[in-house]
Amino acid sequence: STFQVSLAQKKSTPAKKPSMVQITTDYGTIKIKLYDETPKHRDNFIKLAKEGFYNGTLFHRVIQGFMIQGGDPNSKNAPAGQPLGMGDVGYTVPAEFNPALIHKKGALCAARTENPTKASSGCQFYIVQGKTYTDAELDQMEMRTGIKYTPAQREIYKKSGGTPFLDMNYTVYGEVTEGLDVVDKIAAVQTNRQAGDRPVQDVKMTVKVIE
């Protein structure tokens, strides 16, 4: 039958690209699954991780109830108190927006500067902590942004929380599968507002690809 033909074809697809990464910090380990629906961001992150690009960089911007941000190459060995966040790799990644991929707690997302196509930084990322929302708040959000959430997405924002105001504005390209407690621990560190919300004690990372 034709059904069996399609099954046979499926089997011969090329080996799946790696899509799991691990971020190790003094606060513990965060495991992240990169989404296949955002292949440009997935492949770029894997490439940088394999090159060791992120090793020794910091979570340089941390805001409790919002997110933890990292991936600035200038944060390696940066003197204490130096504001960070301008370092880059010299290219951007085209936005890969998908209404199914939301800024729930634990979402891995691409940072970016203001630009008309909302292209992502080639290296800087953030992991969402966020807060929980009520139905009324989500209704207002939908009116403001024009986004319509599914009942399942609403449940996520009501129960686990996130940052829905960033949806379809910044590319979401992965999610934490283990170590949400580590995200919470990092989000709670003491920060220096004058240095762009940089943690007072450096939060260094190493990132490796889990093959």
PLM-predicted stretches and their roles:
Residues 3-211:
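Cyclophilin-like peptidyl-prolyl cis-trans isomerases
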